[in-house]
Amino acid sequence: MRRALHLLALAALVVTVSARAPVAEGATPAVDVPGPGSTVRVDAAAGEFENGSVIVRGVSGHLAVRLGAGSAPLLQDALSVLRLTDTQVAGRAIGDPLPPLTQRATVTGHRPVTLVLRFRVPDATPPGIYAGRLDFSRNGHGFARVPVRLRVFGVQMPARDDPTAFRTLFLIQPQTYLAAVLTGSGIEPQSGGPGIVDRLYAFLSEYRVSPGDWGFGTPWPEGYVDRTGWFRAAATRMAAEGAYPFTAMRLPLGTQRSPASRTGQSARTPETWTAYLTGQVLPFWRDHDWLDRALVWGWDEPGPVYGRQYAAPQACAAHAAGVAYLTTGAPAQRIPARRVTIPWGQGTRSFTIRAHGTGNGFLWDDRGCDDVDIWAVLSRRVYGSFATPVEHRSHIDVQRELRPAIDTARARGASIWSFTYESKAGLGSPGYAATEPATDARVFGLWNALEGMDGTLYADGMVSYGGLDPYKRLTQHGQHVLIYPALASTDEPVSSLRLENLRDGIEDADLARLVVARRGRPALLAILARQRIFSIRGNRVLLGCTSGCDLVTKTKYAWPRYRHGAGTNAALERVHSALLKALAPVPA
């Protein structure tokens, strides 16, 4: 099972494993294993990361965990032990950074310590049960032994560069990450810079997160040439960064919100794009076999006016170069005015419901060169919204009125993705803020699979530290930081509790899509309904909003109720196991 979650959720389901020996200070240390039994149990597919967790209590001093003698070699190679630590977010301490235990081994006081046990299961791992034992010690003296069992199913995760898998695109600023690591380690950029950046992109690839920025690999006006200095060597840096497998490869053209680029290109002058792409960019990408995953993201939420002025000519420019075009926004049609008659006292009364919505059918009419290939739709705008009293009494169903346009664009060949940003109170769908339950990120991945999304985009950043030490404090609600700086210049980036859930959500989305492809959507609905992940009745997803939806909730936009309280992590683990069981026999 996968475990990576908040201390309160973990503490709700624990079984204490008795200590082997008392500690010198007189306290009796113990290791709690969430869930039934005293064994850490992890279910996984080949090519997947999976987490277990334990809570260590009653320990002060130097804490160490290692695999005991006789443990399966796969476990020896795959295990990383991470320690959940706190940072300040919106005025309170929140458990989020996950540095390696070896670099945060000193435990002070008697506060419980949550450890995340991260297993990386290699591709093509044979199905079976891989058993071992975790030995816990304090100041070199053992105090507990805990069995561990990794159960690998006969399921292979999609390749990390498979464009038919669940795709991702996350904005990230490698320059900001590099500066943070250099500040913490005190080394000079010229001696450690390339390695630090390479480890960042390798880490993103392992976690199935495709970068929305290539940083030092961004080409110059003359293309991929190496200028003086490693950070100006565009060809060398892009070859290194792009060598890691990603499902999506964003071409170096920004949106209207992007800072000035060293390419010299602008989102407002798409008439120069085709020549730049075909002459300076695509030959390099073709030589590296990246074109099957290439896309242009050129405008953020254009609306009908900017859609005609910018998104449409951008799409034509991308298509003239032979690459896909993405925009954030939704296929939309204007809802015409309607005259309705409703019961009123002893008689009836007529009302006019005004026309509303903005149409952008010219971007998905299957005519001309300007159709959008990939729509990244804000999750809260996938269905519809609340009904007014007149609409409600007229039996007009507005909770799903946005879906027909999306479904039509999909039927005409468009790929539909999702995107999200900070989920403020009442907006009605999960996001990646540190002030939300960490499980929201994983639930969001399952929702994407449930609604047939082909990918997801995130534009709030992953390493935007705002000049702060992220180990001490995050800006706003933490939504701009999903990765923490490596604690040593030669280390990989430090994960977060939210990023572990995000990665799990991406992997679950891939597994869920496989279940739908092989067994149909009802099979996925049944798995999710059994664990109450979403409001599902029969084969129908029930939506909630303030008025006129299937359910009454506090949200303006229609969205299913989703699980986010105590017990959510355990329920998600059961969903993960059920997905694996739906795809392959249980290993013996």
Name each model-derived stretch:
Residues 2-24:
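Secretory targeting and sorting signals
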Residues 22-37, 49, 59-117:
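Surface-exposed binding patches on compact interaction domains or structured appendages
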Residues 54, 134, 296, 448:
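Conserved, mostly hydrophobic/aromatic
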Residues 55-71, 104-163:
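Extended acidic/polar, glycine-enriched regions
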Residues 143-257, 286, 291-295:
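An acidic-aromatic substrate-binding cleft motif
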Residues 278-332, 345-346, 352-359, 453-454, ...:
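Catalytic domains of carbohydrate-active enzymes that cleave complex glycans
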Residues 303, 307-422:
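Noncatalytic carbohydrate-binding groove/subsite architecture in carbohydrate-active enzymes
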Residues 409-441:
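Active-site clefts of carbohydrate-active enzymes
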